[in-house]
């Protein structure tokens, strides 16, 4: 989670017992500063560390977005004649040093990487960190990962990096058809949001929303991942149909795999005896509605699964 709500706000709500979520936060790496900020980041991790709100992760922005030519690409944008490839926000050599230091300190790295160059340099830095620090259960992950060079897809599994997609973006809206594919050409556009290919490579795929940029409703993301169509109308053409995934994999990406990214898979993410009952009940239709809640929706009841047939308060 890194959703424009500062750590002190979450911490204050937690202290007042008003935080109705379990929040795993990412501490932001300021790309205008250098290694001197590490002490501040360590202090924040120590300060924000309760069962309800903790910050084990550092988020590093590596590039911008495709629509305004700031995503970092391996090859130039095709709609410009100045050989422009976007912008890496951190030089590769410095990135290697940053990631190696943070990894050695036990931080999980959360990359913002949109373009194929940003994705490659993220993976390169994690490979350097692993060579220097050794292998550990780090669960580093990369978010957004819009455009892959297919040669880098197998590296996710090789380096134990989780692919954190926002599946709601993987359909042919105007951001894709008017602001993205014309900048890349058809050959590269084939590798936009290659969720199916990443799954087939054996990498762990988790889903998020990038709320509040787009809806936090996971049902929209699940439908988009399965159909590659507009989930609100289902009338758009399927966008790179070969990258569709099945329903079970889409649900897993939002549940057990997302719990895994947050080191919470022993407590939540699946319906098992002893786990937290973080669940809702829905009907089975595509145009579904949540069933009427038994309790007022602003009241949160902490539950654990006591048996396969009933729940009891924790």
Where are these regions (language model features)?
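C-terminal substrate/ligand-recognition segments
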Residues: 95-100, 104, 202-211, 247, ...
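Conserved helix-loop functional segments at active or binding sites
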Residues: 101, 124-132, 260
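Short catalytic-loop micro-motif centered on adjacent basic/acidic residues
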Residues: 1-2, 108-113, 140-143, 206-208
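Active-site-adjacent C-terminal substructures of enzyme catalytic domains
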Residues: 147-249
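Divalent metal-coordination and catalytic microenvironments
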Residues: 55, 64, 112, 142, ...
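Metal-coordinating catalytic core of metallo-dependent amide/deamination hydrolases
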Residues: 3-120, 124, 155-168, 222-224
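Short alpha-helix capping/helix-loop boundary micro-motifs
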Residues: 262-267
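C-terminal cap of metal-dependent C-N hydrolases
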Residues: 217, 229-241, 246, 251-256, ...
